Amino acid sequence: MDKNEIILKLKNTSTSPGVYLWKDAKQNVLYVGKAKNLRKRLLQYFDGAINSYKTSKLMSLVADFEVYICKTNKEALLLEKAMVDRFNPEFNILLLDDRKYPYLKVQLLKDSLLITLSRKVNTKYTKNTLYYGPFPSGYGAKPILKLLQHEALYESGLLIKNNDSSFWVNQFAKIKEILSFKNNNYLNELTNKMHTAANNMQFELALFLRDGLTYLKKLKESQIIELSQYKNIDVFAYKTDEKLIYATVLFYRYGVLINKVNLTIPLGISIDESIRVFFEQFYADKILPDNFIVQEEILKYDLNLSSDYKFISPKIGTNKKVLDLALLNLNDYYEKEHLIMQNQLEKADSMLSSLNKYLNLPKLKNIVIFDNSNINNINPVGVAIVYTNGIKNKSLYRKFNLEALSYRSADVDYIRQSITKFFSSDKNTKDFDLIITDGGLQQVNEAKKTLKVLGINIPVIGLVKNEYHKTRALIDLNLNEIYVNDLELHNYLAQIQIEVDRFAKSHFRNRQKISSLEGKLRNIKGLGHNMEQKLLNHFKSYAKIYDASVEELAKIVPFNVAKSIKNKDYE
């Protein structure tokens, strides 16, 4: 269909909410979008209301469209996500921020209180669960975790047991009160406890309380009293250039600034669509705040978000001050990053174009690379890493434990196992533009054979290393070994091999460590199979068991066993 025929067809399209697909002349899906009013949204593409550097390119390829009517916004959101996963459209964006930020999770149970750190948030949590966060990755959450565990779960250094439910209700309320920072009562109480411990020569306890007190005071100092009535407020500020959106998010909890996140968002077919995708993807695993404080232009966009997203654009007062603070941080981030990001995008685009001269594929948006690692076929592992638009997409990295094999060609079979595990998982999209195996002709042929068994049709190439473990050549789509003379492309492919090798070896070392930890744990006196399973069910891995404090371990196993684990008292 030409432009006039499409517009004519659009005029008969439903005005209901739903999902739309722009298609090219071969019926390939170019873009999947969501709209409150399908007809109005689709017509906007032709009247100039939707405009970015990608819009004109998209519309030059459009030859048809398809719509799906939905009853609710949530239904449309789920369908849109499913369609994007299914078709991997060229013009849809994916947030490349793979960071998972920890939350303090306080859960009131029938006869106890559970205080942990969690990177997974149940957004449908009940009144008996409190999430406090997100904290910065790598630090910040552990001091307050240990302090609150000490405060709520221990008395005179001993784990509290066998108290009635009303006691734990009071402890839960106390934790909520502490985290609200309503006054200095708890800080004063903590100061007195610290001095008492020091006077009684309990220096280890005094130091522990001092560290907790210092941390809480820093949080308290950042508190904006006028915001303390709100449990959660997030401040979102952004600015754009031709290809990217730069954003800063400030997280306020009861008026306390607990985290700041700077990130870069790929600019899709329009700014409003890109910002909508950001909010839906970024907050998919986070607690939505009571309010978002944003710039005025955000309110003008048709973001088509659920009613749970509440936006405020202040002109005066405290809210304006925190928005100005976010903008100040944003400008600093932009000045440092925008040239770097532009160069990175331009280089990635150039490298994909250079690579495609050898392949002649329709597009190279998503590439998945497979590798494995083992020593003498002991504890073999496999990994998959993904590059989106030529840039590492760590949110789609995957790792697998493989079945150990003893024969000489096991290395080739490990590619089969990795590809099978990757594409058999419902969590992974199957719509990739290219597969790269770390290895030569044998690995490429094994990958092709495996894909045929799985009923998946994706082109496969290989990257061959020399005797010094450096990138030597490319196995192309016709199974020819090609030496890449383009030095920049050669270095780019070498970096991909280095990255997949790094990820594979990192996972292998972790598996070796866990295997070793597993054996040591079973040598601890008084720790049997059932107790081991309880620990694993709670901590999820052997490494986390060994990283846990005595107090955390004692919630699951007897105190003497917890102490033996921490002291590494192996028989």
Swiss-Prot record:
Every UVR domain range: 184-219
Keyword Transferase among record annotations: no
Locations listed in the record: Cytoplasm
GO biological process, alphabetically ordered: nucleotide-excision repair; SOS response
Keywords, ordered alphabetically: Cytoplasm, DNA damage, DNA excision, DNA repair, Excision nuclease, SOS response
InterPro entries, sorted: GIY-YIG_endonuc, GIY-YIG_endonuc_sf, GIY-YIG_UvrC_Cho, RuvA_2-like, UVR_dom, UVR_dom_sf, UvrABC_protein_C, UvrC
Record GO cellular component, one term: excinuclease repair complex
GIY-YIG domain mapped to chain residues: 15-93
PROSITE patterns, per database record: GIY_YIG, UVR, UVRC
Main location as per UniProt: cytoplasm
GO molecular function terms attached to this record: DNA binding; excinuclease ABC activity
Disulphide linkage map: none
Subunit composition and interactions: Interacts with UvrB in an incision complex.
Biological role: The UvrABC repair system catalyzes the recognition and processing of DNA lesions. UvrC both incises the 5' and 3' sides of the lesion. The N-terminal half is responsible for the 3' incision and the C-terminal half is responsible for the 5' incision.
PANTHER family: UVRABC SYSTEM PROTEIN C (PTHR30562:SF1), UVRC/OXIDOREDUCTASE (PTHR30562)
Recorded family membership: Belongs to the UvrC family.
Name this protein carries in UniProt: UvrABC system protein C
Origin organism lineage: Bacteria, Bacillati, Mycoplasmatota, Mycoplasmoidales, Metamycoplasmataceae
